Amino acid sequence: ESLIGWMVEDMRCGIDLLVSREGVDSKRIIVMGAVAGGGDPAGVTAAVDDRVAVAVPFNFGGPQPESPYPLPEDVETSFNYLGGGSWESTRNLKGTAPGGFFHWAIVGSLAPRRLVYAHEFSWDRERDPVWKRLQSIWSWYEKAENLGFAHGHGLLRGDAKTASHCNNIGPVHRKM
């Protein structure tokens, strides 16, 4: 039992309810997880529930708002793929390091379903090592068209005028 386990089970019960309703197309279920911890349960739920056709897990699997921007040139070898100890207990998934259970692998397990790899702030697409991995995974399935992205602007330490701080998936993030 864990907080993430409870959250994922709650989301799966929500999907059960949706698909039990008349008029709901069970093949078009989308799970979106906004920033500040919502992306984690959205990503894990989509990974364990194949009824999810599209997932939009914000800030889960790759660089975090706290990551340097732009990413360093040696990011392939210097990036912390395990993530740091976080105050958000959903990010500290049990068994991540010893089991090789990296967040990007959870996100990658969604292939070949549709994924929007989403970031709250500016995103260094060219150097993001996880984006490169996700592109490879979706290409193995010959489903590159099922992989998209969304991102905001500015940095974590900016103000509302210079950065897309949010607690939901805002208009700036819906411009892919």
What do these predicted regions represent?
Residues 1-36, 52:
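Gly/Ser-rich "nucleophile elbow"/oxyanion-hole loop immediately N-terminal to the catalytic nucleophile
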Residues 9-10, 53-107, 112, 120, ...:
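Mobile cap/lid helix-loop segments that gate and shape the active-site cleft of serine hydrolases
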Residues 33-46:
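Glycine-rich nucleophile elbow surrounding the catalytic serine of serine-hydrolase chemistry
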Residues 32, 58-59, 152:
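Alpha/beta-hydrolase-fold catalytic nucleophile elbow
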Residues 98, 111-176:
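Alpha/beta-hydrolase-fold serine-hydrolase catalytic core, especially in secreted/extracellular enzymes
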Residues 45-54:
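Conserved hydrolase catalytic core segment
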Residues 1-2, 26, 39, 94-103:
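Active-site-adjacent structural elements in folded domains
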